[in-house]
Design a protein with these regions (language model features):
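Conserved RecA-like ASCE P-loop NTPase motor core of nucleic-acid helicases/translocases
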Residues: 51-58
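Post-DEXD/H (motif II) to motif III coupling segment of the RecA-like Helicase ATP-binding lobe
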Residues: 113-147
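Inter-Walker segment of RecA-like/P-loop motor cores
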Residues: 62-102
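Loop/turn-to-beta-strand initiation segments
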Residues: 51, 80-81, 103-105, 131-136
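Walker B catalytic acidic pair
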Residues: 109-111
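Conserved pre-motif I regulatory segment
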Residues: 1-29
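A short beta-strand-to-loop transition that corresponds to the Sensor-1 phosphate-sensing loop
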Residues: 58, 86-89, 138-142
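Walker A/P-loop
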Residues: 22-43
């Protein structure tokens, strides 16, 4: 049981794991539809004993990961320490919340959106609260053109 990856994603995942040996923040930049969500899912599964957070820009993208969990033969109950949030809601996160929810790992889906003025507030607070948190950012478009 676990998350099976296509060959090109296995190569990327192995590089992610290698980078996490030296760094706390790693980014995967792959084209749309290439399986970034499955790389995220495998990383969350492999770290399921840790307190993890999956942050997405929309409920639709959050729900997509949940569908991938189920299509991989897993259940949400296999991820007892995983929480979900969306950037708009996380922007107003409080210090008290972060004290009560000490995360070890976070996936930033479409991480380029973290650069948005409002959405970055919660992310910055999270990273400042826990500078040793492992961060996996995934995006097909890592450059923000709207700023």
């Amino acid at each position: 049981m676990g998350v099976e990856l296509y060959k090109h994603n296995k190569v990327a995942y192995e590089k992610v794991e290698k980078m996490f040996e030296k760094e706390n923040r790693v980014a995967v930049v792959h084209p749309t539809g290439s399986g970034k969500s499955f790389i995220s899912l495998k990383w969350l599964y492999d770290n399921r004993d840790k307190k993890c957070l999956f942050l997405a820009p929309t409920l639709a993208i959050r729900d997509q990961l949940i569908r991938h969990i189920k299509s991989s033969g897993l259940e949400l109950s296999d991820f007892k320490n995983l929480e979900f949030a969306i950037y708009p809601n996380f922007a107003s996160i409080t210090d008290e919340f972060l004290e009560q929810h000490h995360y070890d790992c976070v996936v930033l889906d479409e991480f380029h959106r973290c650069g948005a003025t409002e959405w970055s507030k919660g992310i910055n607070k999270l990273l400042n609260h826990n500078p040793n948190i492992k961060v996996l950012g995934v995006s097909a478009t890592p450059i923000r053109y709207l700023d």
